[in-house]
């Protein structure tokens, strides 16, 4: 039948993938992961062993199968970054940036996916808290919870949203003082100690123990 012919053709042409640019392969594999029918596409990739000709995936057939097995059959990825993060998690990759660099991806993409992988692994061992939400951001953590839900794991969506809403700052640059101000107005010297003080201020504000106002911060010091 047609499907059998297609399958045979895929098997026969798979070695030609070696002659296609990595950038092009990334675009096509990324499209596959983003598609509603991604499971069927990945199943064919595994069955034909075409993955053997893809960067970093030469001996990862069982890990790719694990990706299928772990996620709910009806699940679809919400973004490319989420899809690649879950792929890296299934492959148990310890250096996401190196893996993605070999796929010729952009630095921004590498950073986004690496952050998702790191956030996912933090959630494997801990519940969410203020600093986790501050460190990785609301959007990333909700993508992580989406992956957890697809695997039948407990999720903390409402807790994450509440923690995000309670944060006084969402990025370091929002703090009303910086190293220059501390040196100019308090006579602090540049160096490791100044960096330590700035980290203490940031942590106290994120934890809700210090308001983000100049006078309060000076009193804190």
Give each language-model segment a name.
Residues 150-221:
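Charged substrate- and nucleic-acid-binding regions of tRNA-handling and nucleotidyl-transfer enzymes
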């Amino acid at each position: 039948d047609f499907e059998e012919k297609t399958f045979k053709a895929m098997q026969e042409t798979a070695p030609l993938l070696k002659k296609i640019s990595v950038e092009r392969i990334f675009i096509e594999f990324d499209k596959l992961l983003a598609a509603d029918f991604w499971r069927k596409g990945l199943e064919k990739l595994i069955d034909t062993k075409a993955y053997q000709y893809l960067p970093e995936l030469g001996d990862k057939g069982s890990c790719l199968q694990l990706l299928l097995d772990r996620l709910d059959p009806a699940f679809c990825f919400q973004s490319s970054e989420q899809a690649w993060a879950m792929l890296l998690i299934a492959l148990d990759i310890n250096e996401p940036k190196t893996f993605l660099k070999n796929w010729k991806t952009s630095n921004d993409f590498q950073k986004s996916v690496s952050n998702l992988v790191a956030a996912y692994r933090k959630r494997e061992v801990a519940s969410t808290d203020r600093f986790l939400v501050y460190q990785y951001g609301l959007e990333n953590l909700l993508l992580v919870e989406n992956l957890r839900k697809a695997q039948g794991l407990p999720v903390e969506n409402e807790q994450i949203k509440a923690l995000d809403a309670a944060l006084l700052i969402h990025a370091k640059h929002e703090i009303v003082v910086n190293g220059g101000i501390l040196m100019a107005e308090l006579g602090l010297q540049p160096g490791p100690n100044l960096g330590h003080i700035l980290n203490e201020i940031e942590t106290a504000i994120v934890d809700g123990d210090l308001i983000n106002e100049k006078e309060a911060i000076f009193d804190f010091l």
